């Protein structure tokens, strides 16, 4: 099992954001996570990725307990996340945003001080080549030299995914990749996710766009009030009476 989340609990004051969440993502699996606003989905992502600490429970990745490991330490193991609101540097070009996300550039940024000039040049060339590879994969060549602040919402979501790809992930937590994205770029994102998954990269995806998500993932979990309400195939889950009441407003 690539990711195992067991009995995770987290409270903020008197509000129980996560109340014993247990779920898993197997090696190379595509798994979806839906639920109403305030269900605890993004809080769960923040716990799993190391941005906040749980009050109880356990997160294991590739068999090892992540404990209190930092987001950077988890990223080095191949566990990375995106954010619903992309966190690009708006004054940097797309290419330079990708280069800034490479190991040794952020989080470990003093590494260059201990390299000989020739080694620095070689590292820079390797990072640039990797950035160009990601740009080609994401079909962003036509905007590669534009400041990222000029990108559309969908292009920023592609760039957010690209920044994660600079770190060689084995499992990506995607936080609402289709939110605010036009249908054409949703299709582009879906195809890129499928292609990455075919290469063996696993995904746990939070999303409100049920149409896009349910044709992408074979396994779906529904959260409500900090708990897993239902799990199964998209067809099974969306026929569950509890899900229809909590998430679909009782719609038939």
Sequence positions of predicted segments:
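Helix-to-loop junction immediately C-terminal to a conserved catalytic motif
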Residues: 49
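Conserved ABC transporter NBD signature motif
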Residues: 57-64, 76-77
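Catalytic Walker B motif of ABC-type/P-loop ATPase nucleotide-binding domains
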Residues: 172-176
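The feature captures the beta-strand-to-loop junction immediately N-terminal to the Walker
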Residues: 34-36
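Conserved ABC ATPase "signature" region
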Residues: 110-143, 191-194
